[in-house]
Amino acid sequence: SYGLALSLISYYVMAGYVNLLAALLSLAGIFYYVIFYSVLLKKATVQNIVIGGGAGAIPPMVGWAAATGHLGLAAWILFAIVFMWTPPHFWALAIVRMKDYEKAGVPMMPVVHGEVKTRRHILIYTIELVAVTLLLPIFNLAGTVYLVSSLVLGGFLLYAAWRVFKVGGNKVAWTMYR
């Protein structure tokens, strides 16, 4: 009831002092995470992290809506960036904590499909993530500094994902997670 009360208060504060779109998105994000992801998905499917990634991708949209009052293409690209980042990030953690997830009955990818398949998926999603980060400059929604930063940081991330894929093990997966 405490969480529900805070959620409702945050909605009314956001609606009253910011704008209705940001408030509704915030409420949708809370519902998505608490009900859809935590209660319904987390222990129901190996795709929990992929589908649940939407919950973590909503806050940038809330911020965008709060600042602009609408959702433009850039907001949706930010959503896509966080959405695509979530699986490789948490699958790397799931490799390291595989026994804990198995004991808790959470069907994370390494528990259900093994480390090798998970490592392959980490690499695939990381390639897709780096591609999505380039959409902002492609659509002239970000400048040269962002483009160069995305390429350099994306290169580091791809290297980390490649090492997870080729080398494997907890130490390499932990580096990818961090």
Which stretches of residues belong to each language-model region?
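Solvent-exposed interhelical
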Residues: 1-10, 86-135, 140
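Transmembrane helix-loop-helix
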Residues: 2-45, 124-177
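Small-residue-rich segments of transmembrane alpha-helices in multi-pass membrane proteins
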Residues: 3-8, 51-67, 116-117, 177-178
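Internal alpha-helical transmembrane segments of multi-pass membrane proteins, especially GPCRs
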Residues: 28, 51, 76, 80, ...
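Alpha-helical transmembrane segments and their lipid-water interface positions
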Residues: 37, 63, 92-93
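A cytosolic-side transmembrane-helix exit/cap motif
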Residues: 41-52, 69-75, 95-106, 165-174
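Hydrophobic alpha-helical transmembrane segments in multi-pass integral membrane proteins
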Residues: 61-74, 129-137, 178
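Alpha-helical transmembrane segments
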Residues: 70-88
